[in-house]
Amino acid sequence: MLMVVSPAKSLDFESPLPSGLPATRPPMLDESARLADILRQMAPQDIAGLMQVSDKIAALNVARFAEWHADYSAPQARQAVFAFNGDVYEGLDAASMDRAGLDWLQPRLNILSGLYGLLRPLDLMLPYRLEMGTRLANPRGKDLYAFWGERITTELNARLQQDGSQVLVNLASDEYFRSVKPAQLAATVWTPVFRDSKAGGPYKIVSFWAKRARGLMVRWMAEQRIESPDDLRAFDVEGYRFNPAASNGTTLVFLRDH
């Protein structure tokens, strides 16, 4: 059973890493290099408009892409699950996981990425910013969905075959999961949904909490060695509970009261 999650805009290339941490190379670096070549030719103001960011952030990313190269190693790169630092990754908290948990996640967790396509937890990455929804014109079309085409789905199918699995747990955002083509995926997609209620109000998807909950579920799956989607219903971390009435088929709804 495989999982997909989104990356994060926030990065951490400063915190100490666990000692003896292994590192692997992303499988689609040739594709990443093609994107970096396109971005390297863009002026700071063009990057700012494309990514809808400030001049300061645009300048930072111009410098990043100017220095980006496919032949990189650990001194300048960092394992993906430790490099991303958003809400999902705070919930996952890889830094406090034991080596056995990381080893379990390595062939199962897939981080969708605008630049790298797919990253495993211990794949080395350089700092970057390139959201999947970016309308970056390229030889294959008008945006990154056109650029990646079926490539991400093909790679996921290869990993599903290697894992001997026919289940993909979707813990990614809609923006990122659009890069996967479910009709061509050799798996059934299961989608956990997290809703919170404050002071007895209606249950709603609250972005911060939902993202954190996705990371919590990834960590819980690693700790419990979850291999069946049916077992996902037992997830009960930080007050979430499975709600059968709100769920439907392969959409599993978890509710929490505040």
Swiss-Prot record:
Pfam family membership, one: H2O2_YaaD
Parts forming coiled coils: none
GO cellular component: cytosol
Record GO biological process: response to hydroperoxide
Family note: Belongs to the UPF0246 family.
PANTHER family, per database record: PEROXIDE STRESS RESISTANCE PROTEIN YAAA, PEROXIDE STRESS RESPONSE PROTEIN YAAA
UniProt name for this protein: UPF0246 protein LHK_02295
Originating species: Laribacter hongkongensis (strain HLHK9)
Source organism phylogeny: Bacteria, Pseudomonadati, Pseudomonadota, Betaproteobacteria, Neisseriales
